[in-house]
């Protein structure tokens, strides 16, 4: 009995010892290293007692750690699984997806250099044919479970780069999408430590642990969020390091180039004005020269009106950028204009620009459109002398109806267009009166605006009409630069309404001449005549004669023989309208540009932006300011008269002249000449 119990105890001990030796092998040190690299180290390792059965637990944990620490890379299966090649006639088995891919490319696709290139896929039932080896090797990735291209946002792997590119578009949120950095470049605040691990797309904006690289774009350093006492920052801090596609450098350089181009063109234009290189009295010459200044970035007036075609640069103020208390944006200064350096140059150029304005406003077409030289205006005052041009007289006779004028203030509106955009100025239809409504080419100093006439004698000539819209905002010079000078009567502003007809003549339609070829039908209806169908000519004459209407009584717009005539007339009218609109727009641009140039010159004169040294130099060399060789308060050069020296002999003079190799240096206080000899 005791022997049987001893045998049972021995078997039980052997059974208990066998699992520890076979089932739970001693773990190798490699899984422990992987475990320490992947999982955070515990605070204090617990001591392992020798009495507890540790080997089985340790083996289970090591196996789980090895499975987690070594996942299938690039989507390939575990090494224990074998992948079979399904190419036609091949039964090769590979241990990994990379090996299978290399096997297919080298064994079945081949190369042109080895004379075994195959461009037809024979994987299973696939018979895709390509034209290049690169194409078929890219196609083979569809059959092989190889996914080397991983998304850095969500960690999903793809077989081909084009599949990854399509997948990235699903993350296309403008606020969080960050493109992958180019090779060799470092994008601050957008770097993932350890490659894409499947973090959220917007997590890297606010977690300091994911921003190991300090910010390089702004001056406030790396963001420190969720802290009790943040470090001091300059004014207007940002709400996170967010990159905006502002492109300050490129836009600033382009803006500087465009402004410099306009600055140089304006300087050249002023030089041409000073040299009178084009006729100021020719509308065509003035328009051609002004064409070169349009659509350019001209200097911005300080506190004055801006041309409508010049966009105003908008300042950019975002968090972390330029703040009012910090460094401002880069400022550049253009060199002064060489052709407008003195005050005299500015005054002369202002006179030339005034003459150009007179030429623009006195253009025959636009003066006729304004009602100055219309055919119906037969009234000519006896006091007016005959003028060869259509321009208005510079002085009005005292008996003519005039308007009381008053000085107007400068307009501070940023645009220099007409205050009455759609409503023309309502003035009596007089050639002289229409040019006293603020449109005459007057100087900047003698600006006037229209007020209702206040006189007793001439008020009965014309009815009292309402004043122009926004008359108080009309500025000096040429404030209303609408399209062509609008008609001065109550008519519209379209070309069809500008037609003037001479009245006082009664007219009627021209009587139509009787057609002698049409004979009266005197035939009698009867069987003796014969029943026959009348010819087309006879039927047409019979049907047209009783209902025919005189062509002179039909509206010309309705009287057309065919539709082609109406279409051609419509096309002609449309073309004429387009030409008129284009001409009017060009005229408006010329007027606006001249107004801007005159405001620019006036602003420089008001601020004193001219060279004062030239004025002092002119005063220094003027003869009336000299008195006894110098003037008090003006610097004079040291041109002291030197006492005459005794004449040297010709031999000494010739020797001294031959030996001097440098110009003579004269002392300021001495009378002797210092000569430098070789």
From Swiss-Prot:
Post-translational modifications: Activated by C-terminal proteolytic cleavage by signaling protease (probably palB/RIM13) at neutral to alkaline ambient pH.
Per the UniProt record, the lineage of the source organism begins with:
Eukaryota, Fungi, Dikarya, Ascomycota, Pezizomycotina
Q: Which PANTHER family match?
A: PH-RESPONSE TRANSCRIPTION FACTOR PACC/RIM101, PH-RESPONSE TRANSCRIPTION FACTOR PACC_RIM101
Q: What is this protein called?
A: pH-response transcription factor pacC/RIM101
Organism expressing this protein natively: Aspergillus giganteus
What are the GO MF terms of this UniProt record? DNA binding; zinc ion binding
Report motif location: YPX[LI] motif 1: 462-465
Q: Which UniProt keywords apply?
A: Activator, Cytoplasm, DNA-binding, Metal-binding, Nucleus, Repeat, Repressor, Transcription, Transcription regulation, Zinc, Zinc-finger
| Skewed-composition ranges (Basic and acidic residues) | 509-535, 621-645
Q: What is its main location?
A: cytoplasm
Q: Which chain segments does UniProt annotate as zinc-finger regions (C2H2-type)? A: 83-108, 119-143, 149-171
Chain ranges for the short sequence motif YPX[LI] motif 2 as given in the UniProt record: 662-665
- Which residue windows does the record flag with biased composition (Low complexity)? 7-25, 397-416
Q: Biased composition, Polar residues: where in the chain?
A: 417-448
